[in-house]
Amino acid sequence: MAFAPKTSSSSSLSSALQAAQSPPLLLRRMSSTATPRRRYDAAVVVTTTTTARAAAAAVTVPAAPPQAPAPAPVPPKQAAAPAERRSRPVSDTMAALMAKGKTAFIPYITAGDPDLATTAEALRLLDGCGADVIELGVPCSDPYIDGPIIQASVARALASGTTMDAVLEMLREVTPELSCPVVLLSYYKPIMSRSLAEMKEAGVHGLIVPDLPYVAAHSLWSEAKNNNLELVLLTTPAIPEDRMKEITKASEGFVYLVSVNGVTGPRANVNPRVESLIQEVKKVTNKPVAVGFGISKPEHVKQIAQWGADGVIIGSAMVRQLGEAASPKQGLRRLEEYARGMKNALP
């Protein structure tokens, strides 16, 4: 779904964004129309479901999940990686890849599916397979922009007792070992349940909040800045050009280009409009553009890279490797084989 705040003229947008140290218009405008809050009472809705659902998301918060059993134990702490292997901010990582003419490999997995011990191993495995950035989903009781594969993954994670606290505890142990940055992807309610300082302390480098209500954009953007976290925003084929410009100005780390209107999940083919969408975004920003939704085959990532994307995001197809396995051990083997195949398909 596309968010629907009042639009502004392109000239006023351009002039408002001249001051480099000021929050982008998308964020700054809301500070004059909403009472600032330290917690995040709303945000930028840039999903691809219906307009009615977008309106509902701006004023409602998903119900809390039912009481769940205690999460699986986190693996024992291991020695931190050497200093030269410590992860860098997302923007630095993407800039280094662009300078080399490389396309970023950005896999997504759900924390806690099937348990957090397996998630910790999956993070290490993906890092070893050459992931440039890892998106880690924090389960939410109403993952409404996601398709059946990720919804089922989220349900398994919640059933295993996965909570934000448990995810952050696991990340404190694992992120010192990783050479690539981790970006948390979750919905509004889980993100607002903890301070951003806790997330940064756990080794998180960025955030993606797909149902971020529009009126909380300024407060979240500002607090993310204060905690050296990069807030990645999404744009979709349904977003008008003036709104897309606002999003690209505000997004940090990279611009997340959703390839299709609809929910997550593998597609047989890449939307042919993605080529022109990439160029439209690149006309208004020099920030990296990463494409996600529906990508599941080596030929998909090759095509998207040829069209000029700076990164390729693979979610449901990654989640399926763990979710459809007979055991965590088998799932990790499947994940490694699949991840290496997708990584090797990129230039």
Swiss-Prot record:
Transit peptide: first to last position: 1-53
Keywords: Amino-acid biosynthesis, Aromatic amino acid biosynthesis, Chloroplast, Lyase, Plastid, Transit peptide, Tryptophan biosynthesis
Localization in the cell: Plastid, Chloroplast
Protein role: The alpha subunit is responsible for the aldol cleavage of indoleglycerol phosphate to indole and glyceraldehyde 3-phosphate. In bacteria, tryptophan synthase alpha (TSA) activity is almost completely dependent on formation of an active alpha2beta2 complex with tryptophan synthase beta (TSB), and indole is usually not released during tryptophan synthesis. In maize, the TSA homolog BX1 catalyzes the formation of free indole from indole-3-glycerol phosphate, independently of TSB.
Quaternary structure and interacting proteins, as annotated: Tetramer of two alpha and two beta chains for the tryptophan synthase activity. Homodimer of alpha chains for the indole-3-glycerol phosphate lyase activity.
Note from the entry: Mutant rescue experiments indicate the existence of a second tryptophan synthase alpha gene whose product might be involved in tryptophan biosynthesis while BX1 might be restricted to free indol production.
Annotated family: Belongs to the TrpA family.
Official protein name in the record: Indole-3-glycerol phosphate lyase, chloroplastic
UniProt source species: Zea mays
